[in-house]
Swiss-Prot record:
This is Ankyrin repeat and ELMO domain-containing protein D. Residues 1057-1080 have a biased composition (Polar residues). It holds the Pfam family ELMO_ARM. Residues 507-598, 859-870, 895-908, 924-1033, 1108-1176, 1184-1213 have a biased composition (Low complexity). Residues 307-466 form the ELMO domain. GO terms for cellular component: plasma membrane. InterPro entries: Ankyrin_rpt, Ankyrin_rpt-contain_sf, ELMO_ARM, ELMO_dom, ELMO_domain-containing. Residues 486-496 have a biased composition (Basic and acidic residues). It comes from Dictyostelium discoideum. The keyword Signal does not apply. One of its GO terms (biological process) is actin filament organization. The gene is elmoD. ANK repeats lie at residues 655-685, 689-718, 767-796, 801-830. SMART domains: ANK. Residues 486-598, 854-908, 924-1040, 1057-1082, 1103-1215 are annotated as: Disordered.
Length: 1267
């Protein structure tokens, strides 16, 4: 069988809607399209290109039925010359055309993926190179040619081996022409390929050998292109240089060569550029400048390596020129190494520390030798060489490049202008820091025990000043200026005396010059000082006291923008001018906020050494974010002023927040963080809460910042003081699935684990909470779903309260999370580990949670006592939530191939297997109430309401109008209900009685409420209720699921048309095959093979009814005009319990028949007489609970016709043609239904039966048109 695919065929500017036929050769169809478009050329030259995919259609996609090669459905296929013919045509034009640019433009218009591959294979590069090497090629022509060569270079079939060296020479010679950007782009492609780089370097070296001065290529690109005003040229040029440095075999030497052309000073003048792409290239060049230092720091010192030995000899010969080198000697200790053998001290920084010491000794020998000439006392020993290695470590961490991934292409690290001053800028910074270190060591009169304090103080000052300086001289002067300011600030803090203490003052040489007595005032404030400036808030807490007097201290904080911050403590006045009648001293201290930074310097030392120290004009932020740093610490009695200064204050605020913490809390952008803060210094620092910047970012920052931190050298396994890891905070927030998955991957990459399972169950060491339970606590359904997607198997980890994830979700009453957890393996039977509470105890028997926890064991009492406002659980919205027991019925008759019915034996010994006994079958013995308009009916009896009424009746009631109900119960529990309605609406109620023979008579009316449509959910079971086997559901079984075979239900119905006076039988799609019955003069096409079908369809005979009545108690039926509802006869089972069910229907002349599993009949049945069809104002509705359409059959209007029993000929209708059509439709439908049953019964003759079924349905459709 052939299939067609709808496509749009395009040729030049024309397009047609056509089909591609599968199974037909593509060449044949292309020939047809060429004829449609009137193409004169040979069709074999043409191909069909799928425009969206950029691929050509092949026979593979045409002939293979299930081919997944390409999807061309509804796509545009362009009819064009095949790739081979296109290339041949273009090459022919390039060879013959004298206009080189025109031929190149033609070539550029064909540069598709397939064309480029074919162009390279056919030697097209030779033609292109010939144009480039041509002397007559203009600059514009070369620009187009270089652009085409750049495009071709990205395809796999391309190799730089195909390109000759003269072409590369032509490319290099055009680097200096600013308007020829393609030459620079082509140079970048060359520099990123090993073969291309070699050819590029050969061309540059060749030019360097033959030219001098400004004609040199490096001079052109450094002094010409980088100094130009075209930002694109600058970016491309610097990109080329960076690529050449990266692929160079000796990058350090290559950079030295570039420095001879003053590239650093040229770039330094361009640092103010704002273009992101250009600034990124500047940052990459800075990384190349410091890569020597980074590489040396990662190269461990090896005393057995000759090159390393020579470096150590260089240091010895510089410091001790008159002595023979010795690897182990006490001179090494004299200059500051820890041991006689210095090799062990280089373990931290490798060769970088050694090279810096060599540079210092060679260029600033006087600084190196001063500690040796002026030897400090043993207590003040200055480990000069060791401090030099520590300074090297600081510089490496300070300037170390950050990791920039493809996801952060716009992220640029910190650019230090001072590094672009000269080639040795970094070495000179090192020398300045060593000088400052010595100054601080002397001023502090430091000992070896506080070495780390001195180092932290110096490194804090350097990290603050370094990004702001443009040259080494400025760097040195600014640091010295800050040191002097701190000395002045300390001196200005001294106040009048209340208590005295003695302190020793040391001179510069460390000797005691004098002993002085200093009088200080104890001033400690408890006043909280809150500030609002650039989004930061800090507080100052302390107590105000003095020894002799009660002092009122007023503090006024003013800023340049006019804002005022005041601190008010106990018994304090906030007025600047205070009159104290009690002669109390009032101290008014004005503090100025300059540039949003607070300086608080009103603290003095007391005899006990409780001091408040404030510092950091930078506000603890390199970026100048305006955060306020006020540090409160307990310091020891100092010998000099500078020792009282807390070292951490220059970088850390009182709450322990580093500048990186402050930037995160102030919601700074990633660009501001990377540009304004040296993140390498603070990545793993913790504040007073134990939060690292990553942990803090996972709590409040956007995903981009978290992603960036995870790609740096941060440790994601440092917990906070509350035990939460960064991943806990990460899971407590909402992310997209892609963000969450990538974040988990980055966390996983930094751990030793290899599965998501270990990260998901990472435990808080304080509360024992996992990230999953943290997400549940915060109600974050998205994160819970993501976690379960990554790790579906949930282990029942218990927290410190004994709860697992499911317990927490239940306590939070989050139905969605509870469902997700159970679906992913959470066990509802596990109790609380400590309190032993079960899940049901935790949910307090909440019905909705109980259904989720245990849908199959929900008790009927819980269901019946639920609120009336609760959602009705029916088959559509709570399938399987309540266990429903069907009424016991005989098994389904089995179908044989000869269309005969064989009834299977029932579980009862008195099974009814003949036609007469089938009249006793309980077809509609118990009618369940159903409300078509979704109303809540609270009835103990089954009521059908189609008029939007809510009924609360405990008897047989008619809800619509004023009806009188007389309930008469006879000894056989048969009640006759006479209902009088003002609208002449009568309800016929037949009580179906089940008689049993076990001598058990019940005087109560038992109700079976097994239908899912029972609105009040009452559930009263019969004492002797046997379930029908699931493989053979009864007719009145309340649920027919999709798994139930069609052949297992037996429901039929009655249908008549306005043109036929006699009702005829029509079967439902689930009825067994019919057998023809010729008992009457006229054949009626109905299922008349059993008394059961006769009973249901109203074709009763006197003999069957008499036999049926003999086996039961008297079943009386009364009928009247108007609307009616009917119940079928009772069945005689082996029980002696009488069950009375009353069905009342009153619908304002609406005839409603409710039968479970069967189509209702549209008239009243008098079991001893004929059948009454409803009055001519009756609307017949059939409500059924079977697998067929749950709705009403079309309404047919009767004519008050009375039918005759079986055997009496039906009166012919007036319109014979329509009547015949009706009969034919019934016959065809019966045949169709029988064929359906045969098809479902087995595979025998299935194709033949399907064919017959199609023919029967087509014939039926033709007859319906005659209606």
């Amino acid at each position: 069988m052939t299939h067609t695919i709808r496509v749009l065929i395009k040729y030049q500017n024309s397009m047609i809607d056509h089909f591609i036929i599968k199974g037909v050769k593509l060449s044949t169809q292309i020939d047809m399209f060429c004829q449609i478009f009137k193409i004169q050329e040979d069709p074999i030259k043409y191909s069909l290109l799928v425009e969206d995919l950029g691929v050509y259609l092949t026979d593979d996609a045409i002939f293979h039925e299930n081919s997944t090669y390409i999807n061309i459905n509804n796509k545009v296929l362009e009819l064009q010359l095949g790739t081979s013919y296109q290339v041949s045509s273009v090459l022919k034009t390039m060879s013959s055309c004298k206009d080189l640019k025109k031929s190149l433009v033609l070539l550029k218009s064909h540069l598709t993926k397939n064309f480029c591959a074919e162009f390279i294979k056919k030697g097209g590069l030779e033609h292109l190179q010939a144009i480039i090497k041509s002397e007559s090629a203009s600059a514009n022509t070369l620009s187009v040619a270089f652009g085409i060569l750049e495009i071709l270079s990205v395809y796999p079939d391309f190799s730089w081996d195909y390109i000759s060296q003269p072409v590369i020479d032509k490319v290099v010679s055009n680097f200096g022409y600013i308007n020829v950007n393609p030459s620079l782009k082509l140079g970048i492609k060359l520099a990123t390929d090993r073969k291309g780089y070699t050819m590029l370097q050969n061309s540059i070296d060749k030019t360097f050998d033959t030219t001098t001065g400004d004609n040199c290529v490096y001079s052109k690109i450094v002094n010409g292109n980088l100094s130009s005003t075209d930002i694109n040229t600058q970016t491309s040029t610097l990109n080329l240089i960076n690529n050449m440095v990266s692929f160079s075999q000796s990058p350090i030497e290559f950079l030295k060569n570039l420095e001879s052309y003053n590239i650093s000073s040229t770039l330094k003048s361009q640092l103010s550029a704002t273009d992101t792409a250009f600034r990124k290239q500047i940052y990459l060049f800075q990384c190349h400048k410091i890569q020597g230092l980074i590489m040396d720091s990662k190269t461990p010192y090896n005393k057995d390596e000759p090159s390393h030995q020579r470096l150590l000899e260089t240091l010895w010969s510089t410091l001790f020129p008159n002595q023979v080198f010795q690897r182990s000697h006490e001179n090494w200790q004299i200059i500051g190494f820890q041991n006689k053998d210095p090799s062990s001290d280089f373990r931290g920084m490798g060769l970088a520390g050694l090279k810096h010491l060599i540079y210092l000794a060679q260029n600033h020998k006087d600084m190196f030798m001063n500690p040796l000439i002026n030897r400090q006392p043993e207590a003040n020993y200055y480990p000069y060489a060791t401090s030099g290695i520590q300074v090297t470590s600081f510089l490496v961490e300070c300037v170390k490049p950050i990791n920039i991934s493809a996801n952060h292409s716009d992220v640029i690290g910190q650019i230090y202008p001072i590094l672009f001053e000269s080639e040795n800028a970094l070495n000179e910074i090192y020398c300045v820091l060593m000088e400052i270190f010595g100054i601080v060591w002397k001023d502090w009169n430091a000992t070896y025990m506080i070495f780390q304090k001195v180092f932290q103080f110096v490194s804090g000052l350097a990290s603050e000043v370094l990004p702001k300086c443009k040259c080494v001289v400025d760097f040195k002067s600014l640091i010295i200026e800050k040191l002097e300011n701190k000395k002045k600030e300390k001196k200005s803090e001294k106040r009048g005396s209340v208590s005295t203490r003695h302190s020793k003052q040391f001179g510069s040489n460390g000797n005691i010059n004098s002993t002085t007595t200093t009088t200080t005032t104890t001033t400690t404030t408890t006043t909280p000082i809150s500030t609002t400036g650039s989004g930061s808030s800090n507080s100052l807490n302390g107590n105000t006291s003095n020894n002799n007097n009660n002092n009122n201290i007023s503090m006024s904080y003013s800023s340049n923008n006019g804002s005022t911050l005041s601190g008010l403590g106990n018994n304090h006045s906030s007025n600047n001018n205070n009159n104290n009648n009690n002669n109390n001293n009032n101290n008014n201290n004005n503090h100025i906020l300059n540039n949003n930074h607070l300086y608080v310097n009103n603290t003095n030392s007391n005899s006990s050494g409780n001091n408040m120290i404030s510092c950091s004009p930078s506000g603890s932020s390199i970026s100048g974010s305006g955060s306020i740093s006020i540090h409160n610490s307990q310091s020891m009695n100092s010998k000099t002023f500078i020792e009282d200064i807390d070292i951490d204050a220059c970088t850390v605020s009182p709450d322990g927040n580093s500048p990186l913490h402050s930037a995160i809390m102030n919601s700074m952008t990633l660009d501001c963080i990377t540009n304004g803060i040296n993140i390498n210094l603070f990545l793993n620092t913790t504040n007073n809460q134990g939060l690292t910047p990553l942990n803090l970012a996972c709590s409040i920052s956007p995903y981009l910042i978290i992603d960036f931190f995870l790609q740096q050298d941060t440790d994601p396994f440092i917990p906070a003081k509350n035990g939460e890891y960064p991943f806990h905070n990460f899971c407590s927030r909402k992310w997209t699935f892609n963000e969450f998955t990538r974040g988990c991957s980055l966390f996983l990459a930094k751990s030793n684990h290899h599965q998501y399972h270990d990260i998901v169950n990472q435990t808080n060491h304080v509360t024992l909470e996992t990230p999953l339970s943290t997400a549940i606590q915060s109600g974050n359904e998205d994160s819970v779903g993501h976690l379960l997607t990554l790790c579906p198997n949930i282990n029942n980890y218990f927290n410190s309260s004994g709860q697992n994830a499911l317990h927490i979700a239940i306590s939070k009453r989050n139905l969605h999370i509870i469902t997700c957890l159970i679906q992913n393996g959470a066990d509802p039977s596990i109790p609380n580990e400590i309190t032993k509470e079960t899940c049901e105890d935790i949910c307090a028997s909440d019905p909705e949670i109980m259904i989720i926890l245990n849908p199959t064991k929900l008790s009927r009492s819980t269901s019946s006592t639920s609120s009336s406002t609760s959602r009705i659980h029916d088959e559509s919205n709570n399938n399987g939530s309540i266990k429903k027991n069907p009424i016991p019925l005989p098994k389904r008759p089995q179908i044989t191939n000869n269309n005969s019915i064989q009834y299977s034996n029932s579980t009862s010994s008195n099974s009814l297997i003949n036609n007469n006994n089938f009249n006793n079958l309980l077809s509609t013995s118990i009618n369940n109430s159903y409300n078509n308009n979704n109303n809540n009916n609270n009835n103990n009896n089954n009521n059908n309401n189609n008029n939007n009424n809510n009924n609360n009746n405990n008897n047989n009631n008619n809800p619509n109008n004023n009806n009188n109900n007389n309930n008469n119960n006879n000894p056989n529990n048969n009640s006759n209900n006479n209902n009088n309605n003002n609208n002449n609406n009568n309800n016929n109620n037949n009580n179906s009685t089940l008689n049993v023979n076990n001598n058990n008579n019940s005087n109560n009316n038992h109700q079976y409420v097994n239908s899912p449509y029972n609105s009040n959910k009452s559930s009263i079971s019969s004492p002797n209720h046997n379930n029908t086997p699931s493989t053979s559901p009864g007719i009145t079984s309340p649920i027919f699921r999709s798994a139930t075979p069609l052949k297992q239900t037996m429901s039929v119905g009655l249908m008549h048309s306005p043109t036929q006076e006699s009702p005829q039988v029509i079967s439902t799609p689930t009825s067994p095959p019919y057998l023809s019955n010729n008992n009457g003069a006229e054949r009626v096409y109905g299922r008349s093979g059993s008394g059961f079908f006769n009973n249901i369809n109203g074709m009763f005979n006197q003999e069957n009814l008499t036999k049926n009545s003999g086996n039961n108690n008297n079943n009386n039926s009364s009928s009247s005009g108007g609307s009616s509802s009917s119940n079928s006869n009772g069945i005689n089972n082996n029980n002696n319990n009488n069950i009375n069910n009353n069905n009342n229907n009153n619908n304002n002349n609406n005839n409603n028949n409710n039968n479970n599993g069967s189509i209702g009949n549209s008239g009243n049945y008098n079991h001893m007489n004929n059948i009454n069809i409803g009055s001519h104002h009756s609307n017949h509705h059939s409500n059924h609970n079977g697998p067929i359409n749950n709705g009403n059959y079309p309404n047919y209007r009767g004519n008050n016709i009375t039918t005759s029993p079986v055997g009496v000929t039906v009166t012919p209708p007036k319109d014979q043609k329509k009547a015949d059509s009706v009969v034919n439709v019934r016959r065809l439908l019966n045949e169709s239904l029988c064929l359906v049953d045969l098809i479902c019964s087995g595979p025998e003759k299935q194709k033949e039966n399907v064919k017959k079924l199609n023919e029967a349905l087509k014939s039926c459709l033709k007859n319906v048109k005659n209606f």
